[in-house]
Structure formats: structure tokens, C-alpha cells
Regions:
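N-terminal cap/lid segment of alpha/beta-hydrolase-fold proteins
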Residues: 33-61
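Short beta-strand element of the alpha/beta-hydrolase
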Residues: 62-71
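Conserved alpha/beta-hydrolase
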Residues: 88-112
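Alpha/beta-hydrolase active-site loop
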Residues: 119-140
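Primarily recognizes the serine-hydrolase "nucleophile elbow" in alpha/beta-hydrolase
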Residues: 136-196
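Accessory cap/linker subdomain of secreted extracellular hydrolases
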Residues: 173-263
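Short beta-strand/loop motif that positions the catalytic acidic residue
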Residues: 264, 270-272
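Conserved alpha/beta-hydrolase "acid-adjacent" motif
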Residues: 277-285
Length: 352
């Protein structure tokens, strides 16, 4: 296990002194210098400069591309260390012939714009950021603009499905995510993780009832965390925004995912790792089934034994939660890279 691995404390939800984790990405492991064949590009959004980080194959000509949308939180994806799963994923895809791009969030790394945790940093800005990156990627002379894919992780597909409605992607990979509403997911996630950690049913029910009352005010009534906590201090954990703006999470909770996915008619690969405690197989199968109900045959589902939420190998969901507490993670699941790259290659070979 890598003891250098760190987790943002703002990206965890503590209830009953136990760790309850939503769809997040961990704080990445940073290297002192960028990986070979890494390029940087500045893109503009609302007059502010944002940094795009690109990896590119050594060979000349136009290449297919993968645009990464990460999970919940405020962090930079620049200068990832070689042991970071996302470094290995993006490097592996580049070795398979794909250009990759990720754009640092506003206020993170060298990206300008409003602070990542400010009310101005909402879902609409996140969508703008990805669209600006995709348009810059498509304009690059080393990218085949007709073969650009989105790879979105965790909460990323909830942003990505909006992006894919406005940019013609070749396909979409939705990794470790959800298919139902955020509010439903939050309640079920609390219950499920309490069971994973060994809590009794009555305690789980009591906790979920508190969470539901608090989050109804937050997600449905659109009260701010400060307004809620003035009268209900017991809601502190329930309205934790995991370091991002409350406006972003309220807009995420407003999404009707079935309505949004119905608008996207491209091949979709939905993946789930069996050691992931931040979502579950039924949720990801639900997403694949939903997409296929609207666009028959478009969605595929792949399950990865012993893979955790961070695309790392661990023996169980509980072990993954315990590793996070100790600021550790397992090795990257190379099978995930292989299957994703094979799926990309297959869709490249297929006729449009």
C-alpha cells in the first residue's frame, strides 16, 4: 500500500465517527515534473485562463482522443505521480495510440476563474469547462476530431452527459457512477456504507431519517448549508459539500438523469468494480439498462472483480474504506485499462 496517498478531509462524510464516502476522487499523487509527451494548453472560459493537460503518442498524424472528467472535489490533475491510477490509465491509453486531455478546475492548479468552492463554481461552469476543452482538443492538428471519447469517473458522468449533448463525441465511458437521482443515491449510500462498516439496522434507519430531513431542505428547498445549520446543527454532516460549492451540488441534485441520457445516442460503456463502496452494481446496471431502453444496444456493462472506487485493487468494499482512513490505496487495476482500451478500439473500428 502507498502511504503517500492522501484524501481530502472535505471529501469525506463522517457519521457516527465512521467514514461514509460519496462519489469522489481522491487527492491525486503529485510528481515533481510532468510525464513524457505531456503538453499544456491554455483555454479561455468567461475571460479566465484554464490549463489543459494533454498526453500525446509519439507517432505523427491524427489520433483518436479521450477527454477525462474527474470526480467530486477541488483538486488539480497536473503532475500526477507514476503510481497514481489516473497517471497509469492516461499513460496506458496514450501508449495505445490515444491523445488524452483533462482540464484543471477553476481556481485549481494554474486554472483561473472563481474559487472552486465559491457559489459561482456551479454545474454550468463545469460543463463550460469541459466543452471548452473538447473544442480545443478537436481543433488540435494531431487529433482526429471525429473520434473523441469522454471518459468520466464517479460524479463525472453526471456532468459528462450534459457535455455530450453539446459536443459530438464518438462514445462515452461512465466509470463507477450512478443512474438515479443524487438525492436518492445519497440516502442509499449512507445506509449501505453503515452496513458495510457493521452498524445495526436501527442505527442505519435513524441516521438515514436525519439525513433525509436535512438534505430535503438542502436539495429540494434550496436552503444554504448556513441557513440549515442555524436551526439544525445535527445537519452538519448531511449538508457537507465535500469542498465544492453548495450551488454545484444543488444543481447536480436537480438532474433528471433519465431525461438527460435519453438525449445522448452514442455507445456507452458503464463500469463497476466489486470493491467499490461509493456506488454499487445495481446502480450501474440500472444506468446501462436505462440507456438501452432509450437506445437499444448502445450501452455495455463491465464488472471488475476486486476493483475499488479509485480504479485500484482491494479485497473488499470494507477494505477500501479502511484503506482510505489510513490514506492508502491498492495498485491500479490493469484489467480496467485493457478493457477500456479494447472497447475504444472496437468502437473506432465500427462504422459511424
Amino acid at each position: 500500500m502507498n502511504t503517500a496517498f492522501r484524501v481530502r478531509t472535505s471529501a469525506t462524510l463522517f457519521l457516527m465517527k465512521e467514514l461514509l464516502l460519496p462519489l469522489v476522487i481522491w487527492l491525486p499523487l503529485f510528481a515533481q515534473s510532468p510525464a513524457p509527451f505531456t503538453l499544456y494548453q491554455t483555454i479561455q472560459i468567461d475571460g479566465a485562463n484554464y490549463q489543459a493537460i494533454i498526453t500525446k503518442p509519439e507517432t505523427s498524424g491524427k489520433h483518436p482522443a479521450v477527454f477525462l472528467i474527474g470526480g467530486l472535489g477541488c483538486y488539480s490533475l497536473d503532475n500526477l505521480k507514476p503510481e497514481d491510477p489516473f497517471f497509469q490509465l492516461l499513460s496506458g491509453l496514450t501508449q495505445r495510440g490515444y491523445v488524452t486531455m483533462r482540464v484543471d478546475k477553476n481556481g485549481e492548479g494554474k486554472s483561473e476563474g472563481p474559487p472552486c468552492d465559491s457559489p459561482q463554481s456551479d454545474l454550468q461552469l463545469a460543463v463550460k469547462r469541459s466543452l471548452a476543452g473538447l473544442n480545443a482538443l478537436a481543433a488540435s492538428n494531431y487529433v482526429d476530431r471525429d473520434n473523441i471519447f469522454i471518459l468520466a469517473h464517479s460524479i463525472g458522468p453526471l456532468e459528462g452527459v450534459l457535455v455530450a449533448q453539446k459536443f459530438p463525441v464518438r462514445g462515452f465511458i461512465a466509470a463507477e457512477t450512478i443512474g438515479r437521482s443524487w438525492f436518492e443515491y445519497e440516502l442509499e449510500n449512507v445506509r449501505r456504507q453503515l452496513f458495510i462498516l457493521g452498524h445495526p439496522y436501527d442505527e442505519a434507519d435513524r441516521t438515514v431519517r436525519i439525513i433525509e430531513r436535512c438534505q430535503h431542505r438542502f436539495f429540494v428547498e434550496k436552503q444554504t448549508p448556513e441557513q440549515i445549520l442555524k436551526t439544525s446543527p445535527e445537519c452538519k454532516d448531511a449538508v457537507n459539500t465535500f469542498g465544492v460549492s453548495y450551488t454545484y451540488l444543488q444543481e447536480i441534485a436537480d438532474l433528471d438523469l433519465a431525461v438527460e441520457w435519453k438525449k445522448v445516442d452514442v455507445p456507452v460503456l458503464v463500469t463497476y468494480g466489486t470493491s467499490d463502496p461509493a456506488t454499487w452494481s445495481e446502480e450501474n446496471r440500472y444506468l446501462a439498462d436505462m440507456i438501452n431502453s432509450f437506445h437499444p444496444g448502445r450501452a455495455s456493462y463491465l464488472e471488475f472483480p476486486s476493483m475499488g472506487h479509485g480504479l485500484d485493487l482491494v479485497p473488499s468494499k470494507r477494505a477500501w474504506l479502511e484503506n482510505i482512513r489510513k490514506h492508502e490505496h491498492g495498485p491500479f487495476d490493469q484489467e480496467f485499462l485493457k478493457q477500456v482500451a479494447d472497447w475504444l478500439d472496437k468502437n473506432l473500428a465500427a462504422k459511424h
